[in-house]
Amino acid sequence: ELLFSEHHQRHAASAFYPSPYNNAAVLILDAVGEWNASSIHVGQDSKLTPLYEGKFPHSLGMLYSAVTNYIGFKVNSGEYKLMGLAPYGEPKYKSLILDKLLDIKLLVTKQVIEKV
């Protein structure tokens, strides 16, 4: 029998099932997998339940790729270099980025909070 699953469902499963926890919240942040860019799942015993899906183009992963490109690395292959260099940087442009570039809001509904 051939089974199909969604991209974020596979991410959540690969994080939850091998973990030592019987109950856990699983947060997935991706560039884009099918159309989801983020998702929240709750793992309880042997079951994963999706609670939230953030859709493309609202993606922290795509933003990370854009920054990777802006500093001169190749998208979809240079992100690890940016990640490796991150601890050596200074937050020189932090205020500019937060004030002028990003509008980050935490999107957690009452339903998600109650289930977790």
Model-assigned labels for residue ranges:
Residues 1-116:
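Short acidic/glycine-rich loops and adjacent helix/strand connectors
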